[in-house]
UniProtKB/Swiss-Prot annotation:
Biological process, per Gene Ontology: seryl-tRNA aminoacylation
Binding site for L-serine: 234-236, 288, 389
Protein's name according to its UniProt entry: Serine--tRNA ligase
Catalysed reactions, as listed in the record: tRNA(Ser) + L-serine + ATP = L-seryl-tRNA(Ser) + AMP + diphosphate + H(+); tRNA(Sec) + L-serine + ATP = L-seryl-tRNA(Sec) + AMP + diphosphate + H(+)
Pfam families per the UniProt record, alphabetical: Seryl_tRNA_N (PF02403), tRNA-synt_2b (PF00587)
Domains: entry comment: Consists of two distinct domains, a catalytic core and a N-terminal extension that is involved in tRNA binding.
GO MF term list: ATP binding; serine-tRNA ligase activity
Chain positions recorded as ATP binding sites: 265-267, 281, 352-355
Keyword set includes Iron-sulfur: no
Function: Catalyzes the attachment of serine to tRNA(Ser). Is also probably able to aminoacylate tRNA(Sec) with serine, to form the misacylated tRNA L-seryl-tRNA(Sec), which will be further converted into selenocysteinyl-tRNA(Sec).
Principal EC category: ligase
UniProt KW keywords: Aminoacyl-tRNA synthetase, ATP-binding, Ligase, Nucleotide-binding, Protein biosynthesis
Amino acid sequence: MIDINLIRDPKTREKVVESEKKRFRDGLAVGKAYELDRKRIEMNFRLDQINTRINQLNREIKSGYRQGKNKEDGDLSEKVAEIKGLSDEAKGLRDDVKAVEDELNKVMKGIGNIISPSVVVSNDEKDNPIVRSYRSSRNMQKNPRPFCVLMKDFTHSVAGAKVMGHRGYYLSGKMARLAQALTRYAIDFLENKGYTYIQTPVMLRRDVMRKTSQLSDFDDQLYKVEDDLYLIATSEQSLAALYMDERMVPQEVPKKFCGQSLCFRKEAGAHGKDNAGLFRVHQFEKIEQFVICGPEESQKYHEEMIKACEEFYQSLDISYNVVGIVSGELNDAAAIKYDLEAYFPSAEKYRELVSCSNCTDYQSRELEIRYGVVKENNRKIYVHLLNGTMCAVQRALCCIVENYQTGDGIAIPDVLQGYFGGDLIELGP
């Protein structure tokens, strides 16, 4: 969530409202958060007054005892009665403070990160600006077939639906080997850039998941395993929590991770979209870039991360556009986000393979991942967290299959042939 101090200061509070309006919200949550925070401060001030008075009364009672008085004496009995009344008031106040804090936390989680000035203000993804492009020089197959047709003998979607339900699948044979080759190549690619390979938990406790996900994701995206456990939708969630409740000094950052995990998504908002094939499924594998850095370096690493993605897809010789995501399409945690959209020749469309976000200190504040050893202006400083898909394996596989189809089958990209152990997947008629 954002820094509550931004809401307390009238000047910065207006900036938060402006940022919310860029997300095409009314900004009323900012005013509500301000009122709840002020109410909390007032109640805590009253609690401090009560505690101070109780401590004073206890000292006076002890002094009276030392003078030989007992609690039935008039002045002491009045003091004892006052302590009881104050204690009852304090108990009620503490309950009220807890209720206000819970409501404040809920409201604050609904306020998005401060949007970067460079983000285009729009609520229509058609306005996403193209930042950079790459075009393959390979000769494409005429009348290309869609990936779902090309892969049908390897995905066993009917059997998958029987055992798992909608969007279930098995992946077999050389297509599964190609997926494995793509995974190994993506890991090696990032390790060669100084990233530390890490396999993450695929389940997180509810209290941890709440700190790494939007509230709307709990219903729309996340699978619940037990009352207190959820399956991750991306390894970003488990990587973000790796240093939860810790302090990192400048010498420890940046930390750059290549995360590998299975991912699970309900895709509740995608009913009717991409029903065929592996492009949009409930269970998939993903190789993720994740960077932890100091506040002054996150913009630099954000650019480095998207350029690493570009190098990866250039090495696969896949045509793509990098687009900047408009303000109204940003998730709450992101201050700025790039998508890499790759070309699918059968539809003659560019479709998202990569999302790369700078979340600044939005997630680290809730996770209490602090930065440095001193407070700035008596305020805590937090690390910045960045995430970016390197390879969503099933989606990237669909893209490669379409782009590398030939009259004989599926040609294997040069950089994958050593991992795959060949240069062609033969297809039946």
